[in-house]
Amino acid sequence: NEMLQACALLSARDSESAAAMQAASGQDARWLPDLSLSAPAEGREQARKGVIVGDSVKLSARKVLAMTAARFTDARFVPTKTLQSKIWNSAIMRGLLYRIYNGVFPLHTPPFLMPATEEAYLKEIAATRLHITGRFHAVCLSMLVETPFLALSSNASKIERLLTDAGLGKSRMADPARLKQASPEAPFSGDELTAIRAFRQMASERAE
């Protein structure tokens, strides 16, 4: 509490954290969505195909996501990592990394792509019809380019708080049981798109 009281400015990226900081410090605390949501982006109107399955901080969640990827015939594994070394051009090395990183050892693995840059990663998200992930920033980028997503719980409930502030509630959260039955398509409703666009607009205005 003393550390918070000593700060000249208190800011958080979700309303729940801002309220907790304000209660603990007795000072005003502002909040604005993650800055990635205020970035310019292209590709929202392009044709989409396939399913991207991402990763998570938690090994247990990565195992669930890897098993989910195996369910879909057109799924690709695209983690948040950007790896530029030429060694990862080797299918053998990618297959080994996939198995070790996710803690699963299937005979065959889904296509495994590691974009070299954040821009390339965003383009992959913008071109898919569904993104399944356990990463907070992957969800942010999905909203940025209006790609439908399903999200596993994150550490410290970051994703849940993000979606609450965005007006999406828990409809886009998925536990392992739901992912076992998930369809390869989960388009946004009109209300969801309206909420996401309003949230991005608010993020842009507060970031200025």
Language model features by range: what are they?
Residues N1-E208:
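Active-site anion-handling motifs in enzyme catalytic cores
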